[in-house]
Amino acid sequence: MDRAGADMWASTFTLAMAERKPQDVWVLLPEHSLVPGCLDGGGVQYLLVGLSRLQCGHCPGTWDSAHVHVLFHLWWDRASHRGLVKMRIWGQRCRLCPAPGDCQVRPPGEQPFLSRLVLHILQDCYGDGPGPARHPREAYEGCCEACELGVCFLQKAPDPAWSANATKGNFPATAWGGTGTVSRGKPLSTPGDDLGKGGVVIAIPFSLVGTSNDQVPIAEGPAPPAGASLPVTGSCEALVIGQGSIFLSGDSVAMPGGKGFPVAIGDPLFHGPGLLGSSIQTFELKGFLFKGRGSLCSPVGVAQGWGPISLNNGLVPVGKHTPTVFYCVGLSASGEGSLTFPSSLTSIFTNTLSEPTDGPVATKEASITFPFIFTDVKDAVAEVAEGNGKEGGGQGLVPVGHDALPETNAGGLPSQVKGSLALPFPADVQGKDAFTDITEGKEKEGGLVTAGHDAPLEANAEGPITVSEGCITIPFAVFDVIKRKGGGHVAYGPQGNGCFSQGYYQKRQLRSRFHKARCGCRREEDERPGRACRRPHAEPYEDFWIWVSMTVCVFWLMCMCRLNPGIYPQQV
């Protein structure tokens, strides 16, 4: 920002505050080196993201941007009636200039930002009037300077330096003219952000062994929130392709001490891009861990936000850190659930296992454990809680209460726990490994016991067990099935069986254009009779336009012959 632009912002702000609080003196100082989170003397940090018109400092080019960041640091001395505001603007580079050039807000683009700032000061410093409404804005990519510096308020979780604010120690959430705050260390990203950015999404259905038949129903959609029912299942059923285990715990920092309950793993389902971005409100945790059968090893890695992790059977080299990924685990009151993750996770596992390791890689015996925490039980099924939960003889997960857990656990994970679940044990899974609470010396009345002890199912039948987190372990063979199906087998709409590839639809379109749809369909039916019944017919609109084109051509020829009757005899 040049000198003229700085004077314009300062004078406009000073006049606005003088009109409302003439007895006080407020000064605005633009500062190019202002750093988020570094406040001294009880200052308050305030962020605005909005639409403005930018002007290049080297050329006369101007453009509109909805991704303009303005950071304010405020200090208010009530005794001396003096206030100080420091500000910094993050704009965008000019696309017309060959060299990156500074930009500034073109007048009168500063008016909306300063008006919001004045309203914020009047509310927080003087207690006058309501605060501005909050309207979160969508993150924009491109030439954003804040994104390149790693300080973008919208796209990434805040750096620890951004966690400072006022006297409360909270970070201002991204707001359009607002000051909503989130807890220290809590990421700004919402659940399922990475699942809705495009690409294929894979869902692995599972069910508790003993709560259903030997087959696992196919869930035709994303994983639902805790306590809610799974999406409508299809009429057909998928055979079990493997067996894993699920562990639930009532402690926010507990790690599994046993196998937990066995679960039957169903055939993976492929979904198109964007199916989960707007509907996922389930359980999520950054990070994952590899785990194999055999004796436990000393911890050689740390899963982000979870604490020490044991990596077994040499699946991951010592000192190698696993990347951060997003996934969701959905559970229902019937004991069924699904593990949902982007298809890129498959390549991450494959690349990790393909690298040379110090020990043998036994992929057939290997398993992968996904830890998770319950984050949303507000939409729980009340009748299930009243029925099965009180009697203790029903099956499945029953939501109870809304006891908040600590905001961060041992590994520094920003816990987003809003509630907990209660699990009355199924009657026909007796004799299996029980859930354990590995917090030493801690005992709960719900039936959870200390580390290393199996909880007797008879004692648990008296009441539901409150759980707040857990982990699910699936065999690595599931990813072999995913690789065989391929990333191109994406199901859209009601045909959610993962049998159709994108290339298949392109071939169908070409066959329809050259009037070979029927012949091609017969050849495919002979090769793969099991899938022929599920394949759609050629697009009707293509055939329609073909017939329209032919009709127009015939009509044109008839008109030409009628208008020029001598053409035909001459040709003969």
UniProtKB/Swiss-Prot annotation:
One GO cellular component term noted in the UniProt record for this chain: membrane
Location in or out of the cell: Membrane
UniProt entry keywords in alphabetical sequence: Membrane, Metal-binding, Transmembrane, Transmembrane helix, Zinc, Zinc-finger
GO-annotated biological processes: detection of chemical stimulus involved in sensory perception of bitter taste; protein insertion into membrane; protein targeting to membrane
Entries under PANTHER family matching the protein: RECEPTOR TRANSPORTING PROTEIN, RECEPTOR-TRANSPORTING PROTEIN 5
Presence of keyword Membrane: yes
TM annotation in the entry: 544-560
MF GO annotations: olfactory receptor binding; zinc ion binding
Membrane topology label: Single-pass membrane protein
Keyword Zinc assigned: yes
Zinc finger (3CxxC-type) in chain: 52-148
Protein known as: Receptor-transporting protein 5
SMART domains noted in UniProt: zf-3CxxC
